[in-house]
Amino acid sequence: MDIEDEENMSSSSTDVKENRNLDNVSPKDGSTPGPGEGSQLSNGGGGGPGRKRPLEEGSNGHSKYRLKKRRKTPGPVLPKNALMQLNEIKPGLQYTLLSQTGPVHAPLFVMSVEVNGQVFEGSGPTKKKAKLHAAEKALRSFVQFPNASEAHLAMGRTLSVNTDFTSDQADFPDTLFNGFETPDKAEPPFYVGSNGDDSFSSSGDLSLSASPVPASLAQPPLPVLPPFPPPSGKNPVMILNELRPGLKYDFLSESGESHAKSFVMSVVVDGQFFEGSGRNKKLAKARAAQSALAAIFNLHLDQTPSRQPIPSEGLQLHLPQVLADAVSRLVLGKFGDLTDNFSSPHARRKVLAGVVMTTGTDVKDAKVISVSTGTKCINGEYMSDRGLALNDCHAEIISRRSLLRFLYTQLELYLNNKDDQKRSIFQKSERGGFRLKENVQFHLYISTSPCGDARIFSPHEPILEGSRSYTQAGVQWCNHGSLQPRPPGLLSDPSTSTFQGAGTTEPADRHPNRKARGQLRTKIESGEGTIPVRSNASIQTWDGVLQGERLLTMSCSDKIARWNVVGIQGSLLSIFVEPIYFSSIILGSLYHGDHLSRAMYQRISNIEDLPPLYTLNKPLLSGISNAEARQPGKAPNFSVNWTVGDSAIEVINATTGKDELGRASRLCKHALYCRWMRVHGKVPSHLLRSKITKPNVYHESKLAAKEYQAAKARLFTAFIKAGLGAWVEKPTEQDQFSLTP
């Protein structure tokens, strides 16, 4: 092989090898190495085999080599200001200096730019800033911003990415508002939300104003930026402070266990009072400011679709997030009061639930009706054939039974005398019986998603850091005051409606059509968790359970879905009152709109032929701003319950369904049947919604509620037709008891 061939073969490695400092391996005297040395140290240069590359003139005794470049660490993409954004939309614009005034040390420049035949002027202490202001005015001409002059100044004209101050983060994300994109064609904006049928997440371009965007401005569409670290920006407190300087934030309260504190801060803006809660005061201030920005300046935060509240189809008297946070705070605060600020041994819990009642539009008037804890069911050997044991001690089930006690109390209050009728939540119905007074609503709070279908597919809180949507520079302002087309079933409240930018990565339910979705599930006896129902397990027998068969109890998701059809009043109370439904279901953690809405009502949307006044209730579904921390450790074997009017909590052994002394609970079937019998003796027969003569046996009294039983039958049929399984009922012997000894 000749020298030329060897040079060609080694040329590919020359760039790398020539970066070496050969001075380290050369003789110190500069003499030429021998053949042996050259063969070992040859770098493929032109000196031939066994020879080093000769030093070049001017090298000062050193081999000539290129310094290795350091690889730059990629930093955050710098934000695009209005000038850059306008140049991308309309390249080649000419800016003209109109005037320069003021003293030498403080000049004022005025620049102008012509866009689509319209001239926009901007002023500033430098030509650059004057051009920037002119570009901003040009952008505003075709992107409609309410309160643009104030808010754009406060935003500092930074690129923004989607963030969520309702997340479970202690520190604020750097930026607040979503950017805008120029769509290919003008489309009216819509509200983005989520329901069980169709999960809407805007992954395409959105028009930002009701007026059509000129075709000349709509081309070319701006590309979606890939994920990148968010640039520095301003949090809600900073923005609100620039819009309304000098605001004072007040500390209202502190609640919660030591590992899951919740602070409440307030601020008054333009005479309006706003509250915010968070795991620290800083976060609580931010959420109070966020509420003010939404209400007064119409500035709304983005949320990933699965975390957005899903509004009710009925009367909605409150702003969803405000209501959710208030209900959560009230239930947690009451539980703290009942357990000596969480220091009592019975404050230990896995799940906390409660029912809150509102009687108007002001959540300040909300009242806690019941509070409960618990995660376990009765052991089959402790079943009672006299209705003296609680079968299901899960917190949300106990809270609903506590609510029944309150309803009986309110009925008795109405039946006492005319003066007490005004204080009762009930009034006579023109259709017979009683109904709730106008604007009386009940809200169910659960510290985590209910067991069963709602929880099984959303076992973790979403990681919001990886679930942001990125759009082009600019600020997106959502003018929800104007009438905009909106898909049915999505957000109807402007304060919670948000536009989603392209690229939202947190998925909704990726596999909504899988067979496992929506299946009826049963709880595990004396344990936690649920399993799907078996096709042949719809009937349980008393002797079979006593001989060792597992006692099956339907999951909380399934029971709440049942309440959304037959009502929360149950069969006995339905003889007196019209169906009562929860107006909202609020989760303290593990909220996922798609899974929760499916579990609560979407999976039985095929239900039909319901009796009069019965319906498929679709309550408000929402998480809370400050998601509750996970409760670690083993679940306690006890359940706690309290109803308004009680002096103290009642502690029940979930395994036996009775208290530690073996006494029956005030929530057991026997106790509630006693309350029903007492009310039945006071209600005139013409006010009964279902006629029943000489009630004696608990089971027969329940069957007398004909319309309720018909609605329940339609519900069970809907589950079967949807292929979700058959409802598993308890052994009938449990209900074959009377109050007479």
UniProtKB/Swiss-Prot annotation:
Residues 493-503 have a biased composition (Polar residues). Its main location: nucleus. Residues 78-144, 231-298 form the DRBM domain. Zn(2+) binds at H394, C451, C556. PROSITE patterns: A_DEAMIN_EDITASE (PS50141), DS_RBD (PS50137). The active site is at E396 (proton donor). Changing K367N: In NEDHYMS; uncertain significance; mild decreased editing activity. It is an enzyme of class 3 (hydrolase). Residues 63-73 have a biased composition (Basic residues). This is Double-stranded RNA-specific editase 1.
